[in-house]
Amino acid sequence: MAKKDYYQILGIPKSAEEREIKKAYKKLAMKYHPDRNQGDKTAEGKFKEIKEAYEILINEEKRSAYDQYGHAAFENGQSNSTYSTFTNSADFSDIFGDVFGDIFGGNRTQRAKKGADLCYNMEITLEEAVKGIKKEIQIPTLQKCKTCYGSGTRTGTKPRSCSTCHGKGQIHIRKGFFTVQQSCPTCHGKGTIITDPCNLCHGQGRVETYKILSVKIPPGLDTNDRIRLNNEGEAGANGAQSGDLYVQITVKKHPIFEREGNNLYCEVPINFTMAALGGEIEVPTLDGRVKLKIPYETQSGKLFRIRGRGVKSVQNRNQGDLLCRVVVETPVNLNEQQKNLLHELGNSFHGFRGEKNSPRSKRFFDGVKRFFDDLTR
């Protein structure tokens, strides 16, 4: 049975360039791949045709021979092996890897593997978070070996190219009608072999050590904010780029202030005479004390805003506010004279339902009375 023309199989003209061949192959291989057509013998046969056509046309020498002699150019020299290892078919593996990813072509060389990122948890006080601070930290890490400068070899020597993968770090294995790409078992994907390792790092190119860094904390950071320090993570393998260091911020609980966004909150206790008659008190801020006027007849829970005494925004440098919540404190440990004065004051209110002096109390008890009246109807 006559074989079908390779150009027709891929649906391309005989003048097609390399990029057109790859594009056509990617489209057809994705459509007819056995993993997408399980149990479909027709699709399996079609995929074999597509693969065979691609391997011939993507190779300049084979394509030239095919253009001159057709299928006869390969009838005597074609391999019947169903399992063969080869290392010089990069074009096919690259295109196959583009289509099917890590399953068939995802194990790339490990020669330039970036170092791992590190995370450091830093606790700071609220004052430090608001004003900013510079702190020194010590972190365990892997650093580039100072003896071999990351090469892993003894001074004056170099790694030799792996003879199995010819320095590529990967090999390709043909199994039946498809090809599998995997890391080279000899060099473990590095592409090179160290025969004379460095005495300090023993061929690893990196050594375990502690690194001391000075970290600048800008004003305005809050819990769960992170600072990224580029290239301060672990050194990369084989002299590759270092990873990054992330400093995770946790702000300690403050005994007076609570933070919400860029605003600070605090509770300020006042006695009931101050609440009733008004006056002036001093309240704390992170920059010192400030005076706060309490108007007469102030109720417990009222919020007073002191502008510009909060936290500066780390984004736009706008300053938040300090909000003071007044808590009216009931007096305790009263002496007889004080108790008598309070009794006298209470009598002057004409009872606790006084409409004029305690409007909230009157509204409450009027509501209670209506509630019970409704129950007894």
UniProtKB/Swiss-Prot annotation:
The GO biological-process annotations, alphabetized, read as: chaperone cofactor-dependent protein refolding; DNA replication; protein refolding; response to heat
One GO MF term, please?
Answer: zinc ion binding
Cofactors needed by this protein, per the record, are:
Zn(2+)
Q: Which residues form the signal peptide?
A: none
Keyword list (alphabetical) reads: Chaperone, Cytoplasm, DNA replication, Metal-binding, Repeat, Stress response, Zinc, Zinc-finger
Q: Where are the zinc fingers (CR-type)?
A: 132-210
Q: What is its main location?
A: cytoplasm
Cofactor: bound how, per the entry note? Binds 2 Zn(2+) ions per monomer.
Q: What does this protein do?
A: Participates actively in the response to hyperosmotic and heat shock by preventing the aggregation of stress-denatured proteins and by disaggregating proteins, also in an autonomous, DnaK-independent fashion. Unfolded proteins bind initially to DnaJ; upon interaction with the DnaJ-bound protein, DnaK hydrolyzes its bound ATP, resulting in the formation of a stable complex. GrpE releases ADP from DnaK; ATP binding to DnaK triggers the release of the substrate protein, thus completing the reaction cycle.
Kindly provide the name given to this protein in its UniProt entry. Answer: Chaperone protein DnaJ
Q: Which organism is it from?
A: Buchnera aphidicola subsp. Acyrthosiphon pisum (strain APS) (Acyrthosiphon pisum symbiotic bacterium)
Organism lineage:
Bacteria, Pseudomonadati, Pseudomonadota, Gammaproteobacteria, Enterobacterales
